[in-house]
């Protein structure tokens, strides 16, 4: 008989959160395994998995704040709000410095309304918004209340110049936020606040509440 409990997993980018549980199901010989806090396919980092009766406690874990590290790309925006999506808007970013970015970060702290990305798992009449967007349907998502407790610029990664003469800048960021916060949408909104456009790469969840990914004891394969 499998004993109830929790397992900390480090999900690699490219795997779904559901797929990350497969090794545990084989290891423990049970299908009664769930997880708290779905990560985007392209994101990596901490997932807390619950086994057997421990799954009853997942709702209490899901409401915990989350901490992420990511790269903020300024100067363009894509359909997915990920750096390698289809380009939809392009602006300038060569004048944006680490100091000018830091000046606007306090404006993003606290409770606020955020419009989720169209490429998301939010359902409209039972269908994921991302599926509707793929089909070419016009998707309009309502804003949702979120909370950002901490938003820090860790430094500027680089500035690159396109052949068109347009420039874009990349900053390393860290954010601690409430359940339901989309980092992709945050990067979009940061870009708009700076008079340009924004998207994201390398999202990594480093903590759920006080539990850090550095404490993880398993890696999903």
What residue ranges belong to the model's regions?
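Catalytic/RNA-binding core of pseudouridine synthases
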Residues: 1-219
């Amino acid at each position: 008989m499998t004993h109830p409990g929790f397992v900390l997993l480090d999900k690699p980018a490219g795997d779904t959160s559901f797929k990350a549980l497969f090794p545990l199901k084989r290891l423990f010989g049970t299908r009664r395994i769930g997880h708290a806090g779905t990560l985007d396919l392209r994101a990596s980092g901490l997932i807390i998995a619950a086994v057997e009766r421990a799954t009853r406690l997942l709702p209490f874990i899901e409401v915990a704040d989350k901490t992420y590290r990511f790269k903020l790309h300024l100067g363009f925006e894509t359909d997915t709000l990920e750096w390698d999506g289809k380009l939809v808007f392009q602006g300038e970013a060569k004048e944006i410095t680490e100091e000018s970015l830091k000046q606007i970060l306090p404006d993003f702290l606290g409770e606020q309304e955020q419009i989720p990305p169209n490429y998301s798992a939010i359902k409209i009449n039972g269908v994921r918004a991302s599926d509707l967007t793929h089909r070419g349907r016009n998707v309009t998502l309502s804003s949702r209340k979120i909370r950002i407790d901490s938003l820090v610029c860790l430094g500027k990664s680089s500035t690159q110049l396109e052949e068109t003469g347009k420039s874009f800048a990349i900053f390393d960021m860290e954010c601690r936020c409430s359940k339901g916060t989309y980092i992709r949408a945050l990067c979009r909104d940061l870009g708009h606040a700076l008079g340009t456009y924004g998207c994201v790469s390398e999202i990594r969840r480093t903590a759920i509440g006080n539990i850090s990914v550095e404490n993880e004891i398993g890696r999903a394969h």
